[in-house]
């Protein structure tokens, strides 16, 4: 079964990636992703300067997924830019992904200008959706600000750019955000980031399980798959065909990957399950996806991608 895919001018061996934030903080972790069976990998979301992130404990595995309030810990944009530029020289045929986010409007502009002015030629993921910065609202929930920011960005940014979105829950919001995104030459939309401000409780101890924000944190894993599929489907129906979709949320097995693709995703990112299982997860997911395709008689992804049937 052929599970390869074309994306941003490159042919990838399969549709699988890590989600930024998982197993991609250090050179060692990124090298492990590069050596894995993932079709591509994205670096940790970088800020202009290194960040420690929120207080620990800030991540907790639950029976159905995870809750986290990491607070964007990272080693700074220079670290990840230098790493990807070095790989670019060593493996020029490889598709590379950076991920960036500023702490405010000005930092978002500044960090993208830094990428624009660098030697880096790969794809940049602009994170508009971190739910775990105390006192900082998610940019993408402010439609007017999102449009203003992207308008300014595309006055100078000429390299491939995608955006990572939070989950939306209202049809009117899908309509409004898609209308904004369709105005810009985006390579892709990544949907979804974790569902913000969930609460998981240890009933034996009668306390929360993570420290930041009084225990409130972003949900991942099986909890979020129906919401992720809905967002992938909604944007697949609304975005112009030039804007691809990366589906993220709730990937535990090949069936989950298949469903994201069926809803219209071109690539699929794995977060919680990668954290729990390690980079070997990609080999398992690829095998399970191929088994599903074989059972259904599909020989390539494009035979079923985006072809979810309605009743």
UniProtKB/Swiss-Prot annotation:
Binds 1 FMN per subunit. It catalyses: (S)-dihydroorotate + fumarate = orotate + succinate. Pfam families: DHO_dh (PF01180). It comes from Enterococcus faecalis (strain ATCC 700802 / V583). Its main location: cytoplasm. One of its GO terms (cellular component) is cytoplasm. The gene is pyrDA. One of its GO terms (molecular function) is dihydroorotate dehydrogenase (fumarate) activity. This is Probable dihydroorotate dehydrogenase A (fumarate). One of its GO terms (biological process) is 'de novo' UMP biosynthetic process. Substrate binds at residues 44, 68-72, 127, 193-194. InterPro entries: Aldolase_TIM, DHO_dehydrogenase, DHOD_1A, Dihydro_DH_chainA_dom2, Dihydroorotate_DH_1, Dihydroorotate_DH_1_2, Dihydroorotate_DH_cat, Dihydroorotate_DH_CS. NCBIfam families: PRK02506.1 (NF002702). Disulfide bonds: none annotated. It is found in: Cytoplasm. It comes from the Bacteria. Catalyzes the conversion of dihydroorotate to orotate with fumarate as the electron acceptor.
């Amino acid at each position: 079964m052929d599970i390869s895919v074309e994306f941003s001018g490159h042919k990838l061996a399969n549709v699988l990636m890590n989600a930024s934030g998982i197993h991609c903080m250090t050179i060692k972790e990124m090298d492990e992703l590069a050596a894995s069976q993932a079709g591509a990998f994205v670096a940790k979301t970088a800020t202009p300067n290194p960040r420690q992130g929120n207080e620990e404990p800030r991540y907790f595995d639950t029976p159905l997924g995870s809750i986290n309030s990491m607070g964007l810990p990272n080693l700074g944009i220079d670290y990840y830019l230098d790493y990807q530029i070095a790989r670019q020289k060593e493996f020029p045929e490889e598709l590379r992904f950076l991920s960036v986010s500023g702490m405010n409007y000005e930092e978002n502009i500044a960090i993208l200008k830094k990428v624009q002015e660098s030697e880096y030629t790969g794809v940049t993921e602009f994170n508009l959706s971190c739910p775990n910065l105390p006192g900082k609202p998610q940019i993408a929930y402010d439609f007017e600000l999102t449009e203003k920011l992207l308008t300014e960005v595309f006055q100078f940014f000429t390299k491939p750019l995608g955006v990572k979105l939070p989950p939306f829950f209202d049809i009117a919001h899908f309509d409004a955000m898609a209308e904004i995104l369709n105005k810009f030459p985006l390579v892709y939309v990544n949907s979804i980031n974790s569902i913000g401000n969930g609460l998981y409780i240890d009933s034996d101890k009668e306390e929360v399980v993570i420290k930041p924000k009084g225990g409130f944190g972003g949900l991942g894993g099986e909890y979020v798959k129906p919401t992720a599929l809905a967002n992938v489907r909604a944007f697949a129906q609304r975005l112009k065909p030039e804007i691809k979709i990366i589906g993220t949320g709730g990937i535990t097995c090949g069936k989950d990957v298949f469903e994201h693709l069926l809803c219209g995703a071109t690539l699929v990112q794995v977060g919680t399950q990668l954290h729990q299982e390690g980079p070997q997860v990609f080999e398992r997911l690829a095998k399970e996806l191929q088994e599903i395709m074989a059972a259904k008689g599909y020989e390539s992804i494009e035979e079923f991608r985006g072809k979810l049937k309605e009743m």
